[in-house]
């Protein structure tokens, strides 16, 4: 008998299943749609030689790569924004802050928005802390580091480490962070996302 376990990050992370189930489980990570999967979900006819891939890619980048987005897109962008807002509220503002008992939600949200506005840039907890301090908000770099870990373990962001080709080893600082879905930039950055096209493409 197969048993499928899903749930809120506020109560259980997939990494804890190994302890609770004593290794008798298989973890399947489900990612948002790739561009090809997105087109398939929209039932696009690939045999059409006049297919406007540029317009379709624009939709993919500017809406959302989450599966539900293809179901509700005919209802308009407002519906997609409502859906993304609900995702953000549930996962970031509720699940993570509740699970880790984060009291300073303003500071946490500022870090999320800072990371979103700097996707594809080399970052460290220390320079994030310094930048926020210059903007009038003091957050210790160790707190920033914890918040980054929470966002990664909840699959909101992915971290890519730098690699020293000469020494053939990963470097411990100045990592890059990418959003699981660039559609979340609609919520986190609004119209400002337009100026970040290069990093958005890098994220994809």
State what each model feature region is:
Residues 8-10, 14-122:
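Interdomain motor-coupling "hinge/lid" segment immediately C-terminal to the ATP-binding subdomain
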Residues 6, 30, 160-162:
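Conserved beta-strand termini and adjacent loop/short-helix elements that scaffold enzyme active sites
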